[in-house]
Design a protein with these regions (language model features):
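Active-site-proximal alpha-helix that buttresses catalytic centers in soluble enzyme cores
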Residues: 2-3, 7-80, 85, 89, ...
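Short, flexible active-site-adjacent loop segments at beta-strand->alpha-helix junctions, enriched
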Residues: 10, 57, 82, 110-111, ...
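Short active-site-adjacent structural elements
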Residues: 15, 114-115, 143
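Short, glycine- and charge-enriched coil/turn segments that flank and shape catalytic ligand pockets
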Residues: 18, 100, 144-146
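A generic structural signal for short beta-strands and their flanking turns/coil linkers
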Residues: 22, 74, 102, 129-131, ...
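Conserved ATP-dependent adenylate/AMP-binding module captured primarily in the ANL superfamily
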Residues: 90-94
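Non-DNA-binding regulatory cores of transcription-related proteins
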Residues: 96-131, 136-139
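Domain-level recognition of soluble alpha/beta enzyme cores
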Residues: 123-161
């Protein structure tokens, strides 16, 4: 059994003055959400064996803050391929993951993240910024992952963690 974790980058700062969309940083609300997701992952034991992030500043920063706040670490690959990837492109990235990794976290962007959830599970959802989704895949090899094969394990929008709705002790 493999578990794919999809994390949409946290809320970005549209007024930052960044020269390009790729360089847009997180907003203060996004910083708080990324840290809350990281702590949630630590408390619940949802720690990836490996992470792959879009090279966009907001995606990389989301992952860095989550790891720091949660006190967990794993090998990280950064790729521009996830920046404008479609759902099928993400599926190719997933298929290239090492079979020694049982849980892989991929950090990226909407609408692709909603598309990969639907492609793998059939579930239609709009992923708000900072949302973490877990998809269980009944395979031994990442290369065997195919559309429709996944089961939605959980959806954690950051507001559950930042507004007191979910108490993590």
């Amino acid at each position: 059994m493999k578990r794919l974790l999809l994390l949409r980058h946290a809320k970005s700062d549209w007024d930052s003055g960044a020269a390009t969309d790729h360089e847009r940083p997180l907003a203060p609300r996004g910083t708080n959400a990324a840290r809350a997701i990281g702590r949630f992952m630590a408390v619940t034991g949802v720690i990836p064996d490996h992470a792959i992030t879009s090279s966009a500043v907001r995606a990389r920063t989301t992952l860095e803050l989550a790891m720091e706040a949660g006190g967990w670490t794993c090998p990280v690959d950064t790729t521009r391929a996830l920046y404008e990837a479609g759902a099928h492109n993400v599926l190719e990235v997933v298929g290239d993951c090492s079979d020694t990794d049982d849980a892989v976290l991929i950090v990226g962007h909407q609408p692709t993240w909603g598309g990969i959830v639907e492609l793998l599970t059939g579930a239609s959802l709009r992923m708000a910024t900072g949302t973490l989704v877990g998809i269980d895949l009944p395979v031994e090899s990442w290369g065997w992952v195919r559309p429709g094969l996944g089961e939605l394990a959980f959806v954690i929008p950051p507001r559950l963690l930042t507004d007191g709705s979910l108490d993590l002790g």
